[in-house]
From Swiss-Prot:
Keywords: Amino-acid biosynthesis, Cobalt, Diaminopimelate biosynthesis, Hydrolase, Lysine biosynthesis, Metal-binding, Zinc. The active site is at D76, E141 (proton acceptor). The keyword Metal-binding applies. GO terms for molecular function: acetylornithine deacetylase activity; cobalt ion binding; succinyl-diaminopimelate desuccinylase activity; zinc ion binding. This is Succinyl-diaminopimelate desuccinylase. It catalyses: N-succinyl-(2S,6S)-2,6-diaminopimelate + H2O = (2S,6S)-2,6-diaminopimelate + succinate. Its cofactor is Zn(2+); Co(2+). Pathway: Amino-acid biosynthesis; L-lysine biosynthesis via DAP pathway; LL-2,6-diaminopimelate from (S)-tetrahydrodipicolinate (succinylase route): step 3/3. Zn(2+) 1 binds at H74, D107, E170. Zn(2+) 2 binds at D107, E142, H368. The keyword Magnesium does not apply. Its EC number is 3.5.1.18. It is an enzyme of class 3 (hydrolase). The gene is dapE.
């Protein structure tokens, strides 16, 4: 029996599966085959929810006496766009000059391929693991993230599963392998403000009520002053206005409604609830401030709706997990990785409610891009890091 010790072969098998969210595309089947060669038991639960596609997931475990390490990630990928723009077909796993091309090469089929290879090498060298390893893999990370990791964790918990630590194999390194380990993530909160006015002719503003004035005033209250100046482990919270729309194509008509959407990435100064309260307070003050209403006699009439479920800020403090991974990275790459909380959200935001979690994978320079690719040397390097980590974690 040949174990899946080669990360290049593993990744090629996964890339050749066109698993664009929500399609499984054969990727979980390919992964399950690799894991069963190593004695893992596997389950493939499918989760559903209103107004979202059904999603197939995978949970596989190889049990032993000792701590339980979870590797988490996703096999779904974003669409490749126009395939004619690619140097090589996005699902061909073509190799040229020591580089493999393909959608998901770094985000994040590459990380999965390397961890599989690392486990296989450990088993080949040492026999059974002194503990348990599980793979918690979803097909719903790049999509709504409703029928994926969040439900798979609860499904596993209900069946008696618990974990001592987790690694998420997202591409964490900005420039080179070994740059960065993610030990936490900022929270994320999104909302939409709608201001109602009275439609009218632009030449007769006294007969209308322009909602654009109101939306500008309210948005400005969220941009200034800054929410905070950052903390010891997190950069300053940052709000970005992502859309402003009046739905009006005529230049001589005052619209009757204006909307603005925003997203704020926030640090551990705030909880989602305290930040929502701060935003509401700012909007209320601005809506009622005579100095800001530009002659309006009544407060600005607006509605605030929260979009999506907020992601909560978190920071991992587990010294064994962080220290062991840091030492493994340094031993293989020769450099000490930065411990960071930068970047966007990931499924680690769900895992942190079950066990300590960190993120470490390949470099992210080409993720979601045309010609997404990974150096074969990086696949070998990451496999060696994971293999060393597994050996040291289980001692």
């Amino acid at each position: 029996m040949t174990l899946p010790v080669n990360p290049v072969d593993n990744l090629a098998a996964l890339i050749r599966c066109p698993s664009v969210t929500p399609a499984e595309g054969g990727a979980l089947t390919a992964l399950e085959k690799m894991l069963k060669l190593m004695g893992f038991s596997a389950n493939r639960p499918v989760f559903s929810d209103d107004n979202t596609p059904d999603i197939e997931n995978l949970y596989a475990r190889k049990s032993g006496n000792g701590p339980h390490l979870m590797f988490a990630g996703h096999t779904d990928v974003v669409p490749p766009g126009d395939e004619k723009d690619w140097k090589h077909p996005p699902f061909a796993a073509a190799i040229e000059d020591g580089v493999m091309y393909g959608r998901g090469a770094v985000d994040m089929k590459g990380g999965i391929a390397c961890f599989v290879a690392a486990v296989a090498r450990h088993i080949e060298k040492h026999g059974n693991i002194k503990g348990s390893i599980s793979f918690l893999i979803t097909g719903d990370e790049e999509g709504p993230a409703v029928n994926g990791t969040v439900k798979l964790l609860e499904w596993a918990k209900q069946r008696g599963e618990s974990w001592d630590a987790s690694i998420v194999g997202e591409p964490t390194n900005p420039n080179a392998l070994g740059d960065m380990i993610k030990i936490g993530r900022r929270g994320s909160l999104s909302g939409t403000i709608t201001v109602h006015g009275v439609q009218g002719h632009a030449a007769y503003p006294h007969l209308a009520e322009n909602p654009v004035r109101g939306i500008v005033t309210l948005v400005d209250s969220l941009l200034y002053p800054a929410f905070d100046e950052g903390t010891a482990n997190f950069q300053a919270s940052n709000l970005e206005v992502t859309t402003i729309d009046v739905g009006n194509k005529a230049t001589n008509v005052i619209p009757n409604k204006a909307t603005a959407s925003f997203n704020i990435r926030f640090n551990d100064t705030w909880t989602a609830e305290s930040l929502q309260a701060e935003i509401i307070s700012r909007l209320e003050r601005a809506a009622r401030d005579n100095r800001l209403r530009q002659g309006r006699e009544t407060p600005i009439k607006y509605e605030l709706t929260w979009r999506e479920r907020p992601s909560h800020v978190f920071l991992t403090h587990d010294e064994k997990l962080i220290g062991t991974l840091t030492a493994s990275v340094e031993a293989v790459t020769g450099k000490r990785p930065e411990l960071s909380t930068s970047g966007g959200t990931s499924d680690a935001r769900f895992i942190k409610d079950y066990c300590p979690v960190v993120e470490f994978g390949l470099t992210g320079q080409t993720m979601h891009m045309v010609d997404e690719r990974v150096a074969l040397a990086d696949l070998e390097g990451l496999t060696q890091i994971y293999e060393r980590f597994i050996a040291d974690f289980f001692g």
